[in-house]
C-alpha cells in the first residue's frame, strides 16, 4: 500500500493505493479522522478488491458537510449548509484528477463517519457518479433529512449503513432519534438497493476508523 499527499483546489488530499486498484473510495476527513487513516487502512487489509482511498480535507465540518443550514445541535456551532460546494470539489476537481491517475473505468464509492456519512448519502442523491455509499454511523437525525430522502432517491445501488447500539440513547433528544431514523433509512433503501444495516457495540464516539473500514470493505465485496 502506497501513501502520498497532494493539494487540489486548496484542499489537502491523502491517497492510499494498492497495486492495480479496482475500486476507489472517497472520504471527507477532519484533523481527527486524518490521524486515524493509517489504522483505518490497516483494518481494510482483507478487502475483497484491491483499492485506492482518497481522503480529502474538510476544515469546517458542520459548514462543509451539511446539506442545508440548521441551528446548533450541541455547542454553539450551527450547520452551514455548504455541502453542495464540497460536492462541486469532488465532481469538478477530485474525480477528474483520480480518473487521470487510475483510468476512466475505475468505480468510485463515497463514504465516511458521522456527518461525513450523511454527506455521502446526500451526495449520492445529487449524482450518479458513485457505485456505492459507505455510511458509518451517519447523522440521519439531521433536521429535515428523512423528509428529504423520501423524495430524493440515493442513486448508488450499494449502500452500507451502521449505527452503534447505544447511539439512540443519546441525551440530546434530536440525536436520540437516530435509531428510528436509521431503521427508516434502511427500509427506504431495501426495495431497489443492495443494502445492509450493521449494529456495532457501543456509542458514537468509539472505533470510528474500524467502523468506517468495515463499511468500505462491505461496499467492495458488494460491487465487485
Name what the model sees in each region:
Residues 41-44, 123-124, 186:
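A conserved amphipathic alpha-helix that caps or lines the catalytic cleft of carbohydrate-
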Residues 134-136:
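A short, hydrophobic beta-strand element of the alpha/beta-hydrolase
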Residues 1-17:
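N-terminal cap/lid segment of alpha/beta-hydrolase-fold proteins
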Amino acid at each position: 500500500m502506497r501513501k502520498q499527499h497532494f493539494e487540489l483546489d486548496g484542499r489537502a488530499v491523502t491517497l492510499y493505493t494498492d497495486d492495480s486498484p479496482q475500486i476507489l473510495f472517497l472520504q471527507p476527513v477532519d484533523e481527527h479522522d486524518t490521524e486515524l487513516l493509517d489504522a483505518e487502512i490497516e483494518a481494510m487489509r482483507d478487502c475483497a478488491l484491491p483499492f485506492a482511498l482518497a481522503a480529502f480535507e474538510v476544515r469546517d465540518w458542520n459548514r462543509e458537510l451539511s446539506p442545508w443550514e440548521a441551528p446548533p445541535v450541541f455547542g454553539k456551532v450551527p450547520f452551514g449548509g455548504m455541502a453542495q460546494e464540497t460536492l462541486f470539489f469532488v465532481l469538478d476537481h477530485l474525480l477528474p484528477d483520480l480518473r487521470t491517475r487510475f483510468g476512466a473505468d475505475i468505480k468510485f464509492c463515497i463514504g465516511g463517519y458521522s456527518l461525513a456519512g450523511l454527506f455521502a448519502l446526500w451526495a449520492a442523491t445529487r449524482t450518479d457518479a458513485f457505485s456505492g455509499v459507505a455510511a458509518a454511523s451517519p447523522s440521519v437525525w439531521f433536521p429535515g433529512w428523512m423528509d428529504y430522502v423520501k423524495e430524493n432517491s440515493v442513486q448508488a445501488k450499494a449502500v452500507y449503513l451502521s449505527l452503534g447500539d447505544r447511539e439512540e440513547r443519546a441525551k440530546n433528544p434530536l440525536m436520540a432519534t437516530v435509531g428510528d431514523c436509521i431503521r427508516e433509512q434502511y427500509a427506504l433503501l431495501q426495495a431497489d438497493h443492495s443494502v445492509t444495516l450493521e449494529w456495532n457495540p457501543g456509542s458514537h464516539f468509539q472505533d470510528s476508523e474500524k467502523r468506517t473500514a468495515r463499511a468500505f470493505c462491505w461496499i467492495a465485496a458488494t460491487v465487485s
